[in-house]
Amino acid sequence: MNKKTQLISLAVAIATTLILAGCEITPHKVQRVVTSGVLSGNDPAAAIESLAKERLRSYRNNPHQLITDIEDLRKALRDLRTVAEAIWGEEENTVPSEKKYVKYSDDFHAKAVIDFEQGLLTVATLHDSDDPAQTRQQLQAAIVRTLLTPADLTAVDIFTANEPKGSGKPFLRGQVVDHDKVVVEYEWRANRFAEYLVETKLRKRRAKENDVYEVQIALVDDHKELRKHQYSDYVIAAAKRYDLEPELIYAIIETESSFNPYAVSHANAYGLMQVVAATAGRDVFERIRKIPGQPTSQQLFNPAQNIDIGSAYLYILNTQYLKGVRNANSREYAIVSAYNGGAGNVLKTFSSNRNRAVEIINRRQPGTVYRDLTSSKHPLPESRRYLEKVMYFKQDY
């Protein structure tokens, strides 16, 4: 690894460790941590981890500091994009999103992108050496790593180029079959399939100053259904706990993330139900769990926690913010729209006066309420489309 790559990798590792720990990121703090680690001959990551734990303890005494640190998280995510751009180029600086899993490896010279909406896996490697055979080997290794990435989300850090820790059942188990139409689950089959892909499906293209070697793998046709079943126990439990229809929870998950547990967004929404920690997460902590603060990104990447918190927020919308809406169908339309754009914007669709808005909703038929919430009367175009999508997907469950 050259010096430039080492510095880039170190910078990302530092930022990521602080991100995942929920720490305030400042140039002074990073410099202090790195200098301390280097001068003492210790691993800087150990010092960073210690600093992160110290920061987490401070949240117990001052939970509002977490809001400030979320702003630092946004900056750190922008920095991560900058690092990807520095290595791959402006058109290739892919980062995780709501419906795309993105994992860099091999010092950020390899990446895997799973488009859960399109059902497509792409694995790519930069050809920045004089030996094409070496690049092909690196691509083959990246394919194997991706196919065998464990389902245990705590073993995978999507914000760094670190390899997944641990083993166990693959995250993509059942969703990828090899050239013999057999499910890829074990290392020997993953290696065999990766070798076949590199030999027969390799594509080459340009990115910045280097060639890119890549292969694409289509997920099986029922990949969404398979992912749905992985989380069915959590959905059913949450539905019972919060008096919700399982079909509604499934439809929201499909709309928000296409069942991508690693989903992240520019609005700091995480996981399957795209929970925003500072708003929905804080509401659930304070109103349901009766504790201060808000969930961490680690909690929201946990499928069980994410589904519980997202469902609890639906419960809050249903029993508190929009409880005045009497018709069950109208209230469902209202809470779905509010899950995306807030209860305030739902009510503004009908009147600037909240009490008056509820009265208007109660006088209207559910179909009219739906049309109003999906029309230009609602202040947010995204929320209009969101309600349409959720109700469309709900029919499939």
Model segments located where?
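Cell-wall glycan-active module
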Residues: 2, 22-251, 325, 352-376, ...
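Bacterial N-terminal signal peptides that target proteins for export
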Residues: 2-10
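Bacterial N-terminal signal peptides
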Residues: 11-19
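Short, functionally critical alpha-helical segments immediately adjacent to catalytic or ligand/cofactor-binding
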Residues: 236, 243-264, 274-276, 310-311, ...
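Acidic helix/loop microenvironments that form the catalytic cleft of cell-wall polysaccharide enzymes
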Residues: 253-258, 306, 313, 324-355, ...
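Short, solvent-exposed loop/turn and secondary-structure capping segments
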Residues: 262-265, 285-287, 348-352
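Substrate-binding/active-site groove segments that recognize
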Residues: 266-293, 308-316, 364, 390
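A short, structured beta-strand-centered segment in the mid-to-C-terminal lobe
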Residues: 295-306
